[in-house]
Amino acid sequence: MASALEELQKDLEEVKVLLEKSTRKRLRDTLTNEKSKIETELRNKMQQKSQKKPEFDNEKPAAVVAPLTTGYTVKISNYGWDQSDKFVKIYITLTGVHQVPAENVQVHFTERSFDLLVKNLNGKNYSMIVNNLLKPISVESSSKKVKTDTVIILCRKKAENTRWDYLTQVEKECKEKEKPSYDTEADPSEGLMNVLKKIYEDGDDDMKRTINKAWVESREKQAREDTEF
């Protein structure tokens, strides 16, 4: 039952993360319904566990373990990272984390993700889920370290001596979308014209007048230069 509760809790946390990031109404409605179903199932299983009695009257009941608080989990969004030839290292600052029991700091790795859960730190739980890592990692060789007020997640690179420019594939795609696209075989002036055209379309009246004036002056200068030859 304990493993089922843990799996439901992980499902709930992931749905919450997706819900926070989603903007489409249809997707949000679907995720909201799924969140309600998981919360209901989680409550039912916790009630079943608390009501379960020993099979024999003379059997001592097992020690009651406080369930993971479901109502107050803090999403970790601030972190830093760097890399070596073998590892990508993620640094998360959590005041007092070195004082909680070691089993309260859990990290689950897959080839392209990791899931950090810190239980009962100053009465709160802390969660960080990172999916779609830029490149594959070795699950068996990845690990964590707990230092003073800091958790360090060590993702072992599957391909050593390779550089990660970004932590996740999503971050890479977002950054590349921000870069202007250049066609090396195209006329350089055509790229400039496309940029000016976009500025003109998005600009206000003053901007459009400025671009028109610059365009006319440029054409007049070109015409004068042509007549000199």
UniProtKB/Swiss-Prot annotation:
Q: Where is this region: Interaction with SKP1?
A: 74-229
Q: Which residues carry this modification: N-acetylalanine?
A: 2
Q: What's one GO-annotated cellular component? A: cell body
Which residue intervals make up region (Interaction with SIAH1)? 2-81
Residues carrying N6-acetyllysine: 10, 21, 86, 119
Q: Where in the cell is it found?
A: Nucleus; Cytoplasm
Family matches, as InterPro entries: CacyBP_N, Calcyclin-binding_UBL-bridge, CS_CacyBP, CS_dom, HSP20-like_chaperone, SGS_dom, Siah-Interact_N
Which Pfam family, any one of them, does this sequence belong to?
A: Siah-Interact_N
For this UniProt entry, the molecular function terms from Gene Ontology, in alphabetical order, are: molecular adaptor activity; protein domain specific binding; protein homodimerization activity; S100 protein binding; tubulin binding; ubiquitin protein ligase binding
Please give a single GO biological process term from the UniProt record. Answer: cellular response to calcium ion
Give the region (Disordered) as residue ranges: 38-59
UniProt keyword RNA-binding present = no
Instruction: Summarize the subunit comment.
Output: Component of some large E3 complex at least composed of UBE2D1, SIAH1, CACYBP/SIP, SKP1, APC and TBL1X. Interacts directly with SIAH1, SIAH2 and SKP1. Interacts with protein of the S100 family S100A1, S100A6, S100B, S100P and S100A12 in a calcium-dependent manner.
Return the protein name.
Calcyclin-binding protein
Give the species: Rattus norvegicus (Rat)
